[in-house]
Amino acid sequence: MVANPGGGSTDAGGGPVRHIPVLLEEVLAALAPAPGKLILDGTFGAGGYTSAILAAGAEVIALDRDPTAIAAGQAMVAAHGGRLKLVHSQFSHLADHAPQGGLDGVVLDIGVSSMQLDEAERGFSFQKNGPLDMRMSATGVSAADVLNRAKVADLIRIFHFLGEESQAPRIAHAIEKRRAEKPFETTRDLAGLIELVTPRKMKDKIHPATRVFQALRIFVNDELGELAQALFAAETVLKPGGRLVVVTFHSLEDRIVKKFFSDRAGKASGSRHLPAAHERAATFTAVGKSMVSASEAEAESNPRARSAKLRAGQRTAAAAEAADMSLFGFPNLASLGKLGG
């Protein structure tokens, strides 16, 4: 979610208004919340979607892996008389917090919350100087650990695959040279180096550090793996007719969601070079258009919405399929866990 420049005010749900929920009308149209329905918001953040779902009369189970978001959301919990349950959890574990086959909807907003972007000490933004952390929770390796310890070849893989950065080799070798002199500690250390080795051209629309910061954040938090596991989990907790709604912000995430819904449509995916594959029972059917993007008006008023894409599916009565990560064709980035140690 994107921070509200005004900040400081509160909404009807009792929580702070610090964000603009992206594609809110489209999310609600696809999710169809109503009294008597139970919806899981897997990415609570600043509570934008949850607040709107509650306003429609539904009950909500909301998850967030960030303890700061959970603490900030307690006022919203108190304001809704038992209709909101807020849980500190990664959304990949959503099946642990919902009845199997008992949900009417699941919504996931795959992005960094306003609270994380606003706090320099979290290290998510190159626009604010702070420690190179980028962890959405307090566990695991930090972005600084990755930069200071990973092999150059592994940095190139991270920047290229997760950030789609064309200058990955140049940046990785510059990082190797710089860390031999002094370890990376702050966001300014990294952003400054990237600006130095890949000067921004007049035609460029984004800061040269954008893709590297994105890649590090995704790697540190295993965001693609989390998303894939959440999609599989949602398939098990949605009742027939339940809706899965996912909002993504870059092409890697969108490809995962698109691949999942395409696969779960049950169509055979054989090749003319291989034996014919049998069609499977569909576990999801499409809801509305295959992909929805922001209107011109929303993109104008909320720049973050320009890259947002929404995909939604409706659960059928077919049995959930086994989770198979090979569906997405991820490279083995998990092998970087030791960071060259």
UniProtKB/Swiss-Prot annotation:
Reactions catalysed according to its record: cytidine(1402) in 16S rRNA + S-adenosyl-L-methionine = N(4)-methylcytidine(1402) in 16S rRNA + S-adenosyl-L-homocysteine + H(+)
Entry-linked SUPFAM superfamilies: Putative methyltransferase TM0872, insert domain, S-adenosyl-L-methionine-dependent methyltransferases
GO biological process, one term: rRNA base methylation
Residues annotated for S-adenosyl-L-methionine binding in this entry: 47-49, 64, 91, 109, 116
Transmembrane segments: none
One term of GO molecular function: rRNA (cytosine-N4-)-methyltransferase activity
Signal sequence coordinates: none
Keywords: Cytoplasm, Methyltransferase, rRNA processing, S-adenosyl-L-methionine, Transferase
Pfam families, A to Z: Methyltransf_5
Localization terms from the record: Cytoplasm
Cellular component annotations (GO), alphabetically ordered: cytoplasm
Enzyme nomenclature, EC number: 2.1.1.199
UniProt xrefs under InterPro entries: RsmH (IPR002903), SAM-dep_MeTrfase_MraW_recog (IPR023397), SAM-dependent_MTases_sf (IPR029063)
Family affiliation: Belongs to the methyltransferase superfamily. RsmH family.
Function: Specifically methylates the N4 position of cytidine in position 1402 (C1402) of 16S rRNA.
Listed HAMAP family: 16SrRNA_methyltr_H
Name under which the protein is recorded: Ribosomal RNA small subunit methyltransferase H
Organism from which the protein derives: Rhizobium etli (strain CIAT 652)
